[in-house]
Amino acid sequence: NSYGVKQNEIVIALGRVQSNAKGYAAGYVKENNTLENDVDISYDILETNIELKEDDYALIFGVNANLIGISHVTKVGDEIRKNVIGISSVKTLIEEMSSGIPAGSMGVKCTNITKDISEQFNFPEGIYVTEVEVDSPAYKAGLQAGDIIYEYNGGTVGSVQDFSDMILMSEKGDSVTIKLKRTGRGGEYRELEYTVKMGLRLD
């Protein structure tokens, strides 16, 4: 369970480490409980002090030999970011991939509405849509950036992780009902309902 990993906890990387296909390295968790929101999914990110190269890949284990994450090395401009994706945040994705049934895709990127943000901007409960991919199922259905999604097929959406799991449990061609709130010209929120025909998740 990667959600229980604490700061300064010892971790071990096994796999391709420092270009060694059978390499390993030990280190510790510098930061935990950081969320990275991507299209249709949210990752729990752990930052460690383990040095990895751009072409490295490794499984990350805790001191009790329990799998807690997968290395995630990306290059953004000239910067190489070396993080770990918490295994608990991608459990549903792994299960769906293992089943051989491709997961559905909606094409939205969202962020959680924290209590502070809700109070500061008077946002209702739900998750805030930051981006809708052009020509995605959500785009074709009418969803927009700025919408606040609070219900998915009758289920309450309390966090981006909830939403991600719901999407991953859907399949291509499924029609799902999305309830959301959208601000009008006067700043008031209108409740809207859309039917989205799910696409295919390719990664």
Residue ranges with predicted function:
Residues 30, 196-201:
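Short beta-strand edge segments in extracellular beta-sheet folds
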Residues 9, 146-148, 174:
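Structural motif
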Residues 24-79, 125-130:
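Active-site region of chymotrypsin-like
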Residues 67-124, 187-191, 200-203:
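C-terminal cap/linker of serine protease catalytic domains
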Residues 87-88, 151-179:
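PDZ domains, with a preference for the canonical peptide-binding region formed by the helix
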Residues 5-6, 61, 143, 170:
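Short, well-ordered loop/turn sites that connect or cap secondary structure elements
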Residues 1-41, 76-82, 97:
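Flexible, gly/ser-rich surface segments that form the specificity/activation loops bordering the active-site cleft
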Residues 65-68, 138-160:
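Conserved PDZ fold ligand-binding element
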